Amino acid sequence: MDLTEWIVTIIMMIEFLLGNCANFFIMVVNAIDCMKRRKISSADRIITALAISRIGLLWAMLMNWHSRVYTTDTYSFQVTAFSGIIWAITNHFTTWLGTILSMFYLFKIANFSNCLFLHLKRKLDSVLLVIFLVSSLLVFAYLGVVNIKKIAWLSVHEGNVTVKSKLMNIASIRDTLLFSLINIAPFGISLTCVLLLIYSLGKHLKNMKFYGKGCQDQSTMVHIRALQTVVSFLLLYATYSSCVIISGWSIQNVPIFLFCVTIGAFYPAGHSCILIWGNQKLKQFLLLFLRQMKC
């Protein structure tokens, strides 16, 4: 490896370790809290599932990164296809669980008198479950069609490396286009949640000012913490999606591919750290753990 690849390797390993530690920490804390209380809240269920999916996504990204850094001849096209399936599944659940978390914050925190909003708020758990199940059916249908066709192409041209390489490039570009189309929905929903939370916060501050009260009340702080979580998710998700699209179009350009994968890995690692710091329970456990480490 040259100097650039060594630098990318070090950064990737730091992100990989940080992301796994952060997500594993979330899983352990919520598991301990669940055993103590004998129940788990809806928010903790979503965050725990999100942490599990992000651990899987980090490992899938590491597999793709490893296949480009080291000799690609050691990787069969079937192994590459398998790692692609793992990435597609974990990426899908990471995206939609993050979107569902944004919706959860919106309906739990925002205050609107709209009849549809109030109806969805009353049925929130059922609404989120339906969204999760429908999105799951879509991803498995997508994987069934795309990967069966990809494996069939490669099997027909088993002995022709040149043709197989071209087919992989075509499949990568096609998958990138499908990725862009599929991710319009969760990105649009998350963006809508951000805008509605901002509007709700603005309306709340206006009411507080009208009644002559201060702006640092509990509802304002809850709005701000939710916005920090949702906005950070949206920005990191947009950055990650851009990296996936660029890497899909530049799969033969190894430096660009590795750079995009490394930047994209900050999404499942960085947002989990933001979740820990923005969640009162997780933050308290983290500070307690750090104090015990110092002793």
Swiss-Prot record:
<feature type="transmembrane region" description="Helical; Name=3">
    <location>
        <begin position="84"/>
        <end position="104"/>
    </location>
</feature>
<feature type="topological domain" description="Cytoplasmic">
    <location>
        <begin position="105"/>
        <end position="125"/>
    </location>
</feature>
<feature type="transmembrane region" description="Helical; Name=1">
    <location>
        <begin position="6"/>
        <end position="26"/>
    </location>
</feature>
<feature type="transmembrane region" description="Helical; Name=2">
    <location>
        <begin position="46"/>
        <end position="66"/>
    </location>
</feature>
<keyword id="KW-0716">Sensory transduction</keyword>
<keyword id="KW-0675">Receptor</keyword>
<dbReference type="GO" id="GO:0033038">
    <property type="term" value="F:bitter taste receptor activity"/>
</dbReference>
<feature type="topological domain" description="Extracellular">
    <location>
        <begin position="147"/>
        <end position="177"/>
    </location>
</feature>
<keyword id="KW-0812">Transmembrane</keyword>
<comment type="similarity">
    <text>Belongs to the G-protein coupled receptor T2R family.</text>
</comment>
<dbReference type="GO" id="GO:0001580">
    <property type="term" value="P:detection of chemical stimulus involved in sensory perception of bitter taste"/>
</dbReference>
<feature type="transmembrane region" description="Helical; Name=4">
    <location>
        <begin position="126"/>
        <end position="146"/>
    </location>
</feature>
<feature type="topological domain" description="Cytoplasmic">
    <location>
        <begin position="27"/>
        <end position="45"/>
    </location>
</feature>
<feature type="topological domain" description="Cytoplasmic">
    <location>
        <begin position="199"/>
        <end position="230"/>
    </location>
</feature>
<keyword id="KW-0325">Glycoprotein</keyword>
<feature type="transmembrane region" description="Helical; Name=7">
    <location>
        <begin position="256"/>
        <end position="276"/>
    </location>
</feature>
<feature type="topological domain" description="Extracellular">
    <location>
        <begin position="252"/>
        <end position="255"/>
    </location>
</feature>
<keyword id="KW-0807">Transducer</keyword>
<keyword id="KW-0297">G-protein coupled receptor</keyword>
<dbReference type="Pfam" id="PF05296">
    <property type="entry name" value="TAS2R"/>
</dbReference>
<feature type="transmembrane region" description="Helical; Name=6">
    <location>
        <begin position="231"/>
        <end position="251"/>
    </location>
</feature>
<feature type="topological domain" description="Extracellular">
    <location>
        <begin position="67"/>
        <end position="83"/>
    </location>
</feature>
<feature type="topological domain" description="Extracellular">
    <location>
        <begin position="1"/>
        <end position="5"/>
    </location>
</feature>
<comment type="function">
    <text>Putative taste receptor which may play a role in the perception of bitterness.</text>
</comment>
<dbReference type="InterPro" id="IPR007960">
    <property type="entry name" value="TAS2R"/>
</dbReference>
<dbReference type="GO" id="GO:0016020">
    <property type="term" value="C:membrane"/>
</dbReference>
<keyword id="KW-0472">Membrane</keyword>
<feature type="topological domain" description="Cytoplasmic">
    <location>
        <begin position="277"/>
        <end position="295"/>
    </location>
</feature>
<feature type="glycosylation site" description="N-linked (GlcNAc...) asparagine">
    <location>
        <position position="160"/>
    </location>
</feature>
<dbReference type="GO" id="GO:0004930">
    <property type="term" value="F:G protein-coupled receptor activity"/>
</dbReference>
<feature type="transmembrane region" description="Helical; Name=5">
    <location>
        <begin position="178"/>
        <end position="198"/>
    </location>
</feature>
<keyword id="KW-0919">Taste</keyword>
<protein>
    <recommendedName>
        <fullName>Taste receptor type 2 member 120</fullName>
    </recommendedName>
</protein>
<keyword id="KW-1133">Transmembrane helix</keyword>
